[in-house]
């Protein structure tokens, strides 16, 4: 199949959130399945110095009364074709924000539609979040191009209909209060980035006032879990780590922990329980919960905490105040540093994700891959990826709590701190977490099935061996083979 990905981000060149990881990693996994996959993104200013781009455009056109050009280049990691929409509105290095954000991304969606109609015509046009939300609306009139719309974060919904009428052409048949709603209505298939999140957004608690619409379109809505690039994120080959390690020998983590403590200005002590946090410092990520329990946690335990990220100024200053109050035990780096994030994954004992909501989450997957035990709230993709630890039967890969309440989070933190003192069981917990492999290959097969479904391509009947596999590739119990179930 010919598949075109349209998005505002693509890792590693342009990455702000999880969407960049998906757009950067899912296409090569689909290519391995034999599909012709290409990407189209805005031609941001920084890309012209980062990438080798052909000087002459491959396509020129006009939309929304503005001329634009499309240039071709290659993805630096996997070599897939990437098309860049060139226009002065994308010349700055800014990705999001600004008074012209609604116009810029509506223009981008319109340019992508013109390109798909008149240049490289895909069978499936895969759109990501509100930035490309008008594409399914316009493609609704073209029976030769099917559209898939992926919801990465329902909270960001794009410009409202009254503003869209002012900046672009809205078809007579268009319904929906804003870009996100219209995209979900007119896309041939809609998916969220985890099965649990696809169910949660159909409720008033997580639906962002779109739960009625999402229940209305539930027949074409599904949840497909994100994955991790197991080659890029591999502690056995990661050159960012002072000491490499693997599930067969995790002794290198002790060296990484010492280096992390030194770099973050913490007391260098291998026996201290070190917790890490990497990500955007916003309410969604549960930073307010951490602020509410930090004083009690640091008073009751001998734990250490490191936080890496940027975001809300109030939350940044509050975290900085804790670092001043607890020198050597609480450290904050208000920036994003890829090498330091890998050191936190590979050196911290535990990883904090007390999210208010979490569509999927990549950080908990990376943490488990690197042996940092996740402490998460049971919400969204965290439910699908982190199995609660049960010391009685020695199962699970992390510590989980239900309610978005400080006492629940604090209880999980103390419970993990106490478990850390039992190093034998803690090491087994680490090994189980590191053995989880949420690769993009599994996710790509689920997306492939959705693409074939929307294009009307019938799948051959699976053989008996395939029927006996669980959805995540685990083999069925051999002792049950050949046994019949009595009805």
Curated annotation (Swiss-Prot):
Its EC number(s): 2.4.1.21
Keyword Acetylation: no
Pfam families attached to this UniProt entry: Glyco_transf_5, Glycos_transf_1
Entry binding sites for ADP-alpha-D-glucose: 15
Family annotation (SUPFAM superfamilies): UDP-Glycosyltransferase/glycogen phosphorylase
Domain of life of the native organism: Bacteria
Biological role: Synthesizes alpha-1,4-glucan chains using ADP-glucose.
Family membership noted in the UniProt record: Belongs to the glycosyltransferase 1 family. Bacterial/plant glycogen synthase subfamily.
Name of this protein: Glycogen synthase
Organism whose genome encodes this protein: Prochlorococcus marinus (strain NATL2A)
Taxonomic placement: Bacteria, Bacillati, Cyanobacteriota, Cyanophyceae, Synechococcales
